[in-house]
């Protein structure tokens, strides 16, 4: 299946709850309502089926409008949203899920994530309990976490006996998250990457541009392909339709092992987003 741009539809990965999720999706963090509607519409047109938003982004309603206008059948879509830190708690997380559904104009989300563990707040386990309830009531097909460390995930599993389906984390060659990816895999948790382009910081990197020229691909396409070949699912943000089409045109080539290693070797621990160990969350 291809969209008008020629970009192939992303393959899917099976989660530990047996639901399936596309391996590549559109993120809409920090986009205005107008930008969000245009971006989601453009993504759906070229075959993207995973849309990732959050209460904290303030654009759930815009995502919902674009989905409604697209004519794409609900069962073809995979919609993710996230629980904000102020809504952590057993009851509040369930109320927040229903409120997100109202804004999205949907009966359920495919994936509901705790946006940040927010250790200073100390409520993520209670929030997880509420999300288990939301899943049981059919408001969320799958539930997971974002920005969680291995210790946070182990704590959830030990206290609730329910394993997250996904851990969405900052991941790019400057922060390759090898140890956390291994820990996720040990618990059958899918690693989903955000900021795969390191907010653009890697687009002019000599290693990246050199590899891109060898494959006659853009630096962004090479960075996305690297992430996908690690076995990760990926969410990539863009407001520009032509860039969205290019970002999803990454399934017709494969990076050689030496190029994978060269990109992974750029790891220096650089974060472009907040540190989950100390951040109180949004």
Curated annotation (Swiss-Prot):
InterPro entries: AKR (IPR020471), Aldo/ket_reductase_CS (IPR018170), NADP_OxRdtase_dom (IPR023210), NADP_OxRdtase_dom_sf (IPR036812). One of its GO terms (molecular function) is aldo-keto reductase (NADPH) activity. NADPH binds at residues 197, 235, 237-239, 243, 246-247, 273. The active site is at 57 (proton donor). Induction: Induced in response to the thiol oxidant diamide. It comes from the Bacteria. PANTHER family: 2,5-DIKETO-D-GLUCONIC ACID REDUCTASE, NADP-DEPENDENT OXIDOREDUCTASE DOMAIN-CONTAINING PROTEIN. Belongs to the aldo/keto reductase family. This is Aldo-keto reductase BQ2027_MB2996. Keywords: NADP, Oxidoreductase. Its EC number is 1.1.1.-.
């Amino acid at each position: 299946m291809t969209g008008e741009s020629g970009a192939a539809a992303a393959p899917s990965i099976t989660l530990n709850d047996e639901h399936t999720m596309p391996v590549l999706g559109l993120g809409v963090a920090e986009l205005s309502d107008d930008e969000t509607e245009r971006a989601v519409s453009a993504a759906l047109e070229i075959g993207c089926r995973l849309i990732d938003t959050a209460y904290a982004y303030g654009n759930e309603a815009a995502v919902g409008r674009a989905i409604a206008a697209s004519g794409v059948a609900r069962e073809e879509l995979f919609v993710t949203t996230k629980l904000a830190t102020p809504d952590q708690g057993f009851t509040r997380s369930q109320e927040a899920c229903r409120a997100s559904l109202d804004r999205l104009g949907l009966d359920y989300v495919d994936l509901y994530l705790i946006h940040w563990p927010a250790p200073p707040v100390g409520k993520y386990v209670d929030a997880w309990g509420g999300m288990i309830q939301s899943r049981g009531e059919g408001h969320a097909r799958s539930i997971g976490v974002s920005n969680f460390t291995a210790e946070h995930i182990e704590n959830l599993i030990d206290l609730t006996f329910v394993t997250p389906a996904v851990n969405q984390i900052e991941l790019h060659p400057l922060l390759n998250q090898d140890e956390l990816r291994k820990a996720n895999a040990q618990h059958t948790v899918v690693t989903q990457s955000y900021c795969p382009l390191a907010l653009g910081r890697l687009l002019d990197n000599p290693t990246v541009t050199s590899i891109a020229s060898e494959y006659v691909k853009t630096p962004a396409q090479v960075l996305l392909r690297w992430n996908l070949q690690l076995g990760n699912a990926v969410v990539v943000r863009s407001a520009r339709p032509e860039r969205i089409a290019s970002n999803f045109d990454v399934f017709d080539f494969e990076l050689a092992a030496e190029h994978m290693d060269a990109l992974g070797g750029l790891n220096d621990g650089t974060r472009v987003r907040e540190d989950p160990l100390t951040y109180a969350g949004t």
